[in-house]
Swiss-Prot record:
Motif ('HIGH' region): 9-19
SUPFAM superfamilies: An anticodon-binding domain of class I aminoacyl-tRNA synthetases, Nucleotidylyl transferase
HAMAP family according to UniProt: Glu_tRNA_synth_type1
PANTHER family: GLUTAMATE--TRNA LIGASE, GLUTAMATE--TRNA LIGASE, MITOCHONDRIAL-RELATED
Motif ('KMSKS' region): 248-252
Protein name: Glutamate--tRNA ligase
Family of this protein: Belongs to the class-I aminoacyl-tRNA synthetase family. Glutamate--tRNA ligase type 1 subfamily.
EC number: 6.1.1.17
Organism of provenance: Acidothermus cellulolyticus (strain ATCC 43068 / DSM 8971 / 11B)
Keywords attached to this entry: Aminoacyl-tRNA synthetase, ATP-binding, Cytoplasm, Ligase, Nucleotide-binding, Protein biosynthesis
Locations listed in the record: Cytoplasm
Phylogenetic lineage: Bacteria, Bacillati, Actinomycetota, Actinomycetes, Acidothermales
Gene3D superfamilies named among the record's database cross-references: 1.10.10.350, Glutamate-tRNA synthetase, class I, anticodon-binding domain 1, HUPs
Length: 504
């Protein structure tokens, strides 16, 4: 048997992180057994359809490195891979169920169904269709109230419907009794529950890997397989990703539920893959950092934890920092480019000068960022045009008072004659002038210099930053900062909350 698995997202908005989570485990299982991973778009709910959502699904899964073997954009032997392009597929199977007595027409109007549900709630009865239409012809049903000219088709759930089934993750699973599920809507579109079974069978899906919220639907899905004379696939119901309050993670409550949010926030795809794997899987040796290929090599359903994991972004931040620190410098520089372009610190396209400067600067921030987005703030002093450089108001107020003037002047005097403009030479000159010469502690000696050079109290390594900034720009910034300090500091320069100390 060739393993075939699928994910089947709906294009109803921004892709959900759960789509990536399910894709990861489907793909890992398929790769472990040399099988195929299928992407199917379930777009029959036209009321919620969003035009560009399908492309976002493609782009976000590919960004995450979770590519598929067959799908709408690739084709394959079991296409088409959009449900809306398969509508002629479903009706013959509905007719087969009607003919065999496993389904029936229902002419109840939406108003009649709403009133029925309200009455069931009032009487504290289990919800479900009351079978008013079952066994009646259209004419017989039309004589009763709440009639609709446009019928739906419902499954006829037998009294002895099996409610247990084997699951690859959970063992033997019990589910609640289903009611008479609609399988064909009044507009002629199949419902999810019917289309998913037909499509999975016709696409030769051998294993259905999906979230635990579908456990309650599995008995009716299994009935459809049996009634249509099809072999059952095996099921694996994954634990749901949950918020810290244990509620299901949703885009309404948690921005991290949006798959695109992770790219926007500067997470690496390999870090997010690792994190999503940890949400449901443990490696045999207990390690937390592992690649997708390492996960595939060890993959076994017995290692999936059925308990819903809490989506802890703090752990993801730690993993992301680890992966950033592990990148080759040129790779890191390349990945920083779109975020620096978004911040308008480098151009599009990147100039040769910008490219060289970025590759030299990337090591300065590699140990200091947990997100790629954080590099823009740290490197702005280096990449921004000199006429746009400014000192943060808080840094100016706290550091560039009159007592900083002497150390800044001493720094200028020490650096002006320096022939070797390298980080080590800059460090030695400032150490001799400020620490040895003025008797200052290193923190007090170098902080005014840091603020003068970078505009911030927290920055990449100071001496390496000055080397990249260059002699002329470094000395010019020191002179401007010294002038601010000579004038009585930031207060004398008219700096207040929300303003900035310009150094031009």
């Amino acid at each position: 048997m060739t393993v075939r698995v699928r994910v089947a997202p709906s294009p109803t908005g921004d892709p959900h992180v759960g789509t990536a989570y399910m894709s990861l485990f489907n793909l890992a299982f398929a790769r472990r057994h040399g099988g195929a991973f299928v992407l199917r778009i379930e777009d029959t709910d036209r009321s919620r359809y969003v035009a560009d959502s399908e492309q976002q699904i493609f782009d976000s899964l590919r960004w995450l490195g979770l590519d598929w073997d067959e799908g709408p954009d690739k084709g394959g032997p079991y296409g088409p891979y959009r449900q809306s392009e398969r509508l002629d597929t479903y009706r013959p199977y509905v007719d087969q169920l009607l003919a065999s007595g496993h389904a029936y027409y229902c002419w109840c109007s939406p108003e009649r169904l709403a009133a029925m549900r309200e009455e069931q709630q009032r009487r504290r009865q289990p919800p479900g269709y009351d079978r008013l239409c079952y066994g009646k012809t259209r004419e017989e049903r039309a004589r009763l109230g709440g009639f609709s000219e446009r019928p739906v088709v419902r499954m006829l759930i037998p009294d002895d419907v099996p409610l247990t089934f084997p699951d690859l993750i959970r063992g033997q699973v019990s589910a609640p009794r289903p009611d008479d599920q609609v399988i064909l809507k009044a507009d002629g579109f199949p419902t999810y529950h019917f289309a998913v079974v037909v499509d999975d069978h016709l696409m030769a899906i051998t294993h259905v890997v999906r979230g635990e919220e579908w456990i309650s639907s599995t008995p009716k899905h299994l009935l459809l397989y049996d009634w249509l004379g099809w072999p059952r696939p095996q099921f694996a119901h994954m634990p749901l990703l949950r918020n810290p309050d244990k509620s299901k993670i949703s885009k309404r409550k948690n921005p991290a539920a949006r798959l695109l949010w992770f790219k926007e926030q500067g997470y690496l795809p390999e870090a997010l893959r690792n994190f999503l794997a940890l949400m449901g899987y443990s490696m045999p040796d207990g390690r937390e950092v592992f690649s997708f290929d390492e996960m595939v090599a060890e993959f076994d359903w017995s290692r999936v934890n059925p308990v819903g994991p809490v989506f802890d972004v703090t752990k993801l931040d730690w993993l992301n920092g680890h992966y950033i620190r592990s990148l080759p410098v040129d790779d890191l520089a390349e990945r920083l480019i779109p975020y620096l372009q978004e911040a308008r610190l480098i151009g599009t396209p990147v100039t040769p000068r910008e490219d060289a400067l970025l590759r030299a600067a990337a090591p300065l921030v590699q140990e200091r960022i947990a997100h790629l987005t954080e590099a823009a703030e740290l490197l702005a002093f280096l990449l921004r045009p000199e006429e746009e450089f400014g000192i943060e108001p808080d840094a100016a107020q706290r550091v560039l008072g009159r007592d900083a003037a002497a150390s800044l002047r001493a720094a200028i005097d020490a650096l002006e004659p320096l022939a070797d403009w390298t980080a080590s030479a800059i460090h030695a000159a400032l150490q001799a002038a400020l620490v040895d010469g003025l008797g200052l502690k290193p923190r007090h000696a170098f902080t005014p210099v840091r603020v003068a050079i970078t505009g911030r109290t927290v920055s990449p390594p100071l001496f390496e930053s000055m080397e990249l900034l260059g002699r002329d720009r470094s000395l010019a910034r020191l002179r401007r900062a010294a002038a601010i300090a000579d004038a009585g500091g930031a207060d004398s320069a008219g700096v207040g909350p929300g303003s900035a100390v310009r150094t031009d």
